[in-house]
Amino acid sequence: MDPNLKGITGQSFLDDQAECSESDNSEQGCEESLSDLSDLIDNAECEQGNSAELFAQQEAFAFQEHIRTTKRKLKLSFRNPLQCITSQSNRSPGRAAPKRRVLDDSGYNEDILAEVAQVDENGGSEGYGSLASQSLSGQSQKNGKNRVNNGNKENIDCTRLLAASSHRAVQLAIFKEKFGISLNSLTRIFKNDKTCCSNWVGVVFGAREELLAASQTILQRVCDSIMLLTHTCKLGFMGLYLLEFKNAKSRDTVRHLFQQILQVENNDMLLEPPKIKSLPAATFWWKLRHSSAAFLFGNLPDWIARQTSITHQIQEDQPFDLSAMVQWAYDHNFVDEAQIAYYYARLASEDSNAAAFLRCNNQVKHVKECAQMTRYYKTAEMREMSMSKWIKKCLNEIEGTGDWKQIINFIKYQNINFLSFLACFRDLLHSVPKRNCLVIVGPPNTGKSMFVMSLMRTLKGRVLSFVNSKSHFWLQPLNAAKIAILDDATRPTWSYIDTYLRNGLDGTPVSLDMKHRAPMQICFPPLIITTNVDVAKDPTFVYLHSRLMSFEFANAFPLDENGKPALILNELSWKSFFERLWNQLDLTEPEDEDDGDPPSPFRCSARAAARDL
């Protein structure tokens, strides 16, 4: 036993050993902590690694999530162009293909995805990462081919339709390339092939050159003006026609005409009417007419000359002249407002004043004033003429010849002495007092109305109707008539005449009430009345017996086997009757009534006086 250990107790030994172990552990812990701190900073060189690819994948994934969210909001069909960038890019489970797909509208979805899915095949995409784009190039091309094949199967009918309609687009493009202007700028569209027009523009493709040359001569038979210019194009020979036909024709007629002459199909022709009120279109055709390569026949169409000629432009600038319109209506015997408006509007292409009339905003006012002025002139002219002059004027307006014996045979057929009738008719025309009214009485169907109405049309008389007797103005037509007819007078009519019109039947002046005017002093013109009431034998109207010349038509009007009149009573018959019995009726020749001066035509416009020949 060690002497140094003598006197050491057990408790002190344990304490000493415990202190030694604690000191050893603390030193060892310090050494370990120093070794850990020394490895905190690594000064060795670091390699780059694949951080760029990781960043590109993260950006692509974020962009794909943004696209998916946008499509969900817009309710677009889901199409993922980046299928396998990462396993996280296709989180949505696959859906079963629908049994029937609805065609997309005009490529709206494809435009959005096409901008996102475009990848540069040579250098890759810097935004999405070149490595990922290159890895998907093979699969995207394969999927693209499948989509193209499916699209061709679904849209095969649409492709054929577009191919058929594109033929016209190709023709229009060729025309614009050759002439530098669109065909639609020169023509207006007729939707109906049956609509007729005198002017047509035709563009023919693929016709043979010799047929185009032959059409220059063949079309002259049906056209007043021809303009033809030929060119060569990828479809063959192209011919541009501007035609003005003698008669208006429809598109079907013109197409059939070109098919016979040029031997071309329907889809090889473009046929439309020209824009006749377009100054650029008129200028184009005017310049084309002065081209050395153009074939010309006839004069320049009026609608081109009207817009390109200075003379025509000056005429169009002239204001409307009412006196010229009144002169036209007077020369053509138009007094009806509807006829004046219609026929004068038709002259707009020929008369500059008629064209100015159509440009006016108050056409109704001009028409009413023109009709009123024409009636004034005609009435004054009629009053100035004697009965002989008036009959001669009316007969000159009737063309043709008739048989005067038809009237004589009809009078004899009614058992009337012709000489007695002729004497009364002569007094009637000269308005002899107390012999100013001729009455034809008889049963129905004896030809009374036919006899007097044919005379009324010959002498341009007026008709009175007792149905208007409640009006104060029902006798107003007598103011502007050389002869008047009152057909089928009944007993109330004779009672009215016996009460109010005795002086009128005498031929003396009476006061006639006029609408919107003061009463006028006039003498009744010769009056012819037809009736079924025998006034001459009725004592009730005893005061009318001396004022009436009465003849009875007792026999029914003769008819032939076919039910047509056996005797012809018309204007030609009366014309021949007056010419034959002119002297017997004491009618004088117009030359005998003049003072020797040559008659001059009536002129109511301010136009220049015609030079004497």
Swiss-Prot record:
Annotated SF3 helicase domain ranges read: 413-566
Q: Which GO terms describe its biological process?
A: DNA replication
Q: What is the recorded post-translational modification?
A: Phosphorylated.
A GO molecular-function annotation:
DNA binding
* Reaction catalyzed: Couples ATP hydrolysis with the unwinding of duplex DNA by translocating in the 3'-5' direction; ATP + H2O = ADP + phosphate + H(+)
Q: Where does ATP bind?
A: 442-449
Q: Which InterPro entries match?
A: Helicase_SF3_DNA-vir, P-loop_NTPase, PPV_DNA_helicase_E1_C, PPV_DNA_helicase_E1_N, PPV_E1_DBD, PPV_E1_DBD_sf, Rep_E1_papillomaV, Znf_lg_T-Ag_D1_dom_sf
Q: Which Gene3D superfamilies match?
A: 3.40.1310.10, P-loop containing nucleotide triphosphate hydrolases, Zinc finger, large T-antigen D1 domain
Q: Where is the composition biased (Acidic residues)?
A: 16-31, 588-597
Chief subcellular location:
host cell
Q: What does this protein do?
A: ATP-dependent DNA 3'-5' helicase required for initiation of viral DNA replication. It forms a complex with the viral E2 protein. The E1-E2 complex binds to the replication origin which contains binding sites for both proteins. During the initial step, a dimer of E1 interacts with a dimer of protein E2 leading to a complex that binds the viral origin of replication with high specificity. Then, a second dimer of E1 displaces the E2 dimer in an ATP-dependent manner to form the E1 tetramer.
Tell me the protein family, please: Belongs to the papillomaviridae E1 protein family.
Question: What is this protein identified as?
Answer: Replication protein E1
What is the originating organism of this protein? Bovine papillomavirus type 3
The encoding gene is E1
